[in-house]
From Swiss-Prot:
Gene3D superfamilies in alphabetical order: Bira Bifunctional Protein, Domain 2 (3.30.930.10)
InterPro entries: aa-tRNA-synth_II (IPR006195), aa-tRNA-synth_II/BPL/LPL (IPR045864), Phe-tRNA-synth_IIc_asu (IPR004529), Phe-tRNA_ligase_II_N (IPR004188), Phe_tRNA_ligase_alpha1_bac (IPR022911), Phenylalanyl-tRNA_Synthase (IPR002319), tRNA-bd_arm (IPR010978)
TM region positions: none
Record-level GO BP terms: phenylalanyl-tRNA aminoacylation
Pfam families found in the cross-reference section: Phe_tRNA-synt_N (PF02912), tRNA-synt_2d (PF01409)
Cofactor: binding details: Binds 2 magnesium ions per tetramer.
Known cofactor(s): Mg(2+)
Catalytic activity: tRNA(Phe) + L-phenylalanine + ATP = L-phenylalanyl-tRNA(Phe) + AMP + diphosphate + H(+)
Name recorded for this polypeptide: Phenylalanine--tRNA ligase alpha subunit
Quaternary data: Tetramer of two alpha and two beta subunits.
HAMAP family associated with the record: Phe_tRNA_synth_alpha1
Amino acid sequence: MSAPNHSYDPVEVTPLHPDEVARMRDEALEAIAKASTLEELKKVRIAHAGDRSPLALANREIGALPPAARADAGRRVGGARREVNEALKARQAQLEEEHEARVLVEETVDVTLPYDRIPRGARHPLTTIAERMADIFVGMGFEIAEGPEVEAEWYNFDALNFLPDHPARTMQDTFFIAGPDGEESGMVLRTHTSPVQVRALLDRELPVYVVVPGRTFRTDELDATHSPVFHQLEGLVVDEGITLAHLRGAIQLFVERMFGEGLRTRMRPSYFPFTEPSAEVDMECFVCRGASVGNPEAPCRTCSSEGWIEIGGCGVVNPRVLVAAGVDTERYSGWAFGLGIERTLMFAHGVKDMHDMVEGDVRFTAAFGMEM
């Protein structure tokens, strides 16, 4: 049997033939020279110097050559790739310089033009409305409380009497935080500001009178009336002898100071795990004052001619929540409420679309915000 032939003929491996390597290099250099914009040069870089470029694929085939032939082929391919990369670098520097020169010409500032006042910034309307809402309750003797936005499930659900099978505890409603290993961590993006109720009861001496403005998160699609990120103003009172009448009075005072004197409020029975009894709070429409009800000739867009506008939920704090926070339910009672800050802004300023609040358009901020 004759011995195997280990000699290397570069013609047998077409991508590594000297002429083929030179052709690939020349094609790359020609494409680089023709690139007239940085975007075109980016495409040339991918095509002629990327991981799937002809020279890169040829470089991978060097390992299949006989050992004696690898060094020569490696120098040849490596030299070609080096030339291509150096040409890319030089062309990019040239195009960047040309782009900068073009921008300087196109965006030249004529210093001889008359001076215009520089537009002043404005605080976001959500910030100003949240502070205004909180200030009303601070005027009643409440304190501001805050809590983390990444919250433990115990504070967000268990301590607030959410049963394990409650729909809110599913991924369809809640953003769950994965641990470092990708498994469950027991943490969520808080779905409401109510966890701060429990934290306030655990951290403060009784009695507790707090309001909690803050950002919350739910898996809602962004549309005209919903957003996955929204803001709430939570209120909590826990003291001796507290009744639903005190809650009704606080809500009434808030509505009158926020929307106008003489507006009526009402409560409709509802259900929340952390309050019992629970209620939805409506206020009399501050535009039509009920005059549009049953009057097709004078419809009201604000209340849809119903005469009432829903503004939030409330109720007497469920004893189980107080027990979870270590409060003596024989001695203390309390109530809580939750108001939507975006919803309040929509009513106060006639904002129709949630997109306007979250997309960061400075024109919206300038129109409804407070100038700095």
